[in-house]
């Protein structure tokens, strides 16, 4: 079966003990980026709460969780603090696992000796051919998707 899947879907399939390979295209990877933006009208206690959340989000725990799904944290050094040496080697350095590699929920994803598809962070990010954003036709596509789901 060939399927277009995002990293969390691949994590879910592998955590069920099923073989699943993330096959890169010869043209390169497609990548997405996400971030935070505050309206200039955000003031006072609301701004304080937003900054507290953003600081927590970038402090490492969330980044490690995302890394364990196959995504990448915006702040790699803080995420590294929440990962074992073996996890970091597997997810970020393209090294063979020394022991079991677990999903964010604790399910087994890989065994000793296995390597992550696509290699290291540098290999994968160095092979990005297209950066995606929300497409102009996003609202149309979401509307059509919802119509299909409702039918």
Segments predicted by a language model, with ranges:
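Ligand-binding pocket segment of bilobal, Venus flytrap-like solute-binding proteins
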Residues: 1-23
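Mature extracytoplasmic/periplasmic domains
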Residues: 39-116
